[in-house]
């Protein structure tokens, strides 16, 4: 069966050299997504519903007719990205064998740059074989890596953990996945030895780096600043449909309901934005710092927080040197996003289980005599 599935298209390697990642073509993710929607044809389906939405809205007696029409139009527009994302997931689920073969060939690891070649080859394969209408399926190597971790790596490891029949189907229906997982683990282990074995450079200016607890009056002020920086109105565009659902309420109630809904969603995003912003190699360096400190005192966690804040700012992972508020926040982050998910037997979406880091998380726990926070 493996002989029948091509690793590359019939046009050969020279054709792939003409492809590049959407990250290098489009201005940002939004323009890329709009382009993908335009090429997919879903927007034509949506436009066909606009006259009906306007007519039904103007004829509605629930609320102001014009406002109802506007809300319906916005709801149709908001549906397009959702449909596009779901369709891309469906396409990916049918191409896991090809993705696994590309991984086996390129042997990527923790670093996102390792995945750029995999993303380019996979994008061009889908386009040339008419499985996708453009050569821009994955925006960059990071997206390709995360897709592998969620659709192949986590199910394979979870199946090993509990031998759950729900996960056994991936090995039966999708060949090469186990080999791809093994190749990935081998490369990650080699990169871990390089990261952890590298002699730590003394950060001479680390003593001058202030933690947010030393510059803000309280943690609430720091949290509000974080929420303000990370807030994006586009994230809440689909919530506009809530106005239509509750159109029989007064305008004041509608506004209050929407604001409260957005507030709680922002708090949830506030909890998840930090682990999402860290790539696998950033997490490996964070765990290496914990192991190297060899202790669980507040002072050592403060040191880890300073190192991480400085490093993530220098790598442009974070906009400022305020990733962690203090050592306690740093320790709580370790508990929530690493220790609590260790050897989990089920997915913790939207959080990553970090299954490739489990043995390093254990080592970090042992090095600092870790005890969960109360």
Swiss-Prot record:
| Transmembrane residue ranges | 37-59, 63-85
Q: Which UniProt keywords apply?
A: Membrane, Transmembrane, Transmembrane helix
InterPro entries recorded for this chain? Answer: DUP/COS (IPR001142)
- Which loops or segments lie on the Cytoplasmic side of the membrane, by the record? 1-36, 86-374
Primary residence: membrane
Q: Which residues lie on this side of the membrane: Extracellular?
A: 60-62
Kindly list the biological process annotations in GO that this record carries: endocytosis; protein transport to vacuole involved in ubiquitin-dependent protein catabolic process via the multivesicular body sorting pathway
Q: How does it sit in the membrane?
A: Multi-pass membrane protein
**What Pfam families does the record tag this protein with?**
DUP
Location comes to: Membrane
Give the GO cellular component terms, alphabetically.
cytoplasm; endoplasmic reticulum; endosome; membrane; nuclear envelope
Additional remark text = Present with 2370 molecules/cell in log phase SD medium.
What does the similarity note say? Belongs to the DUP/COS family.
Q: What is this protein called?
A: Protein COS10
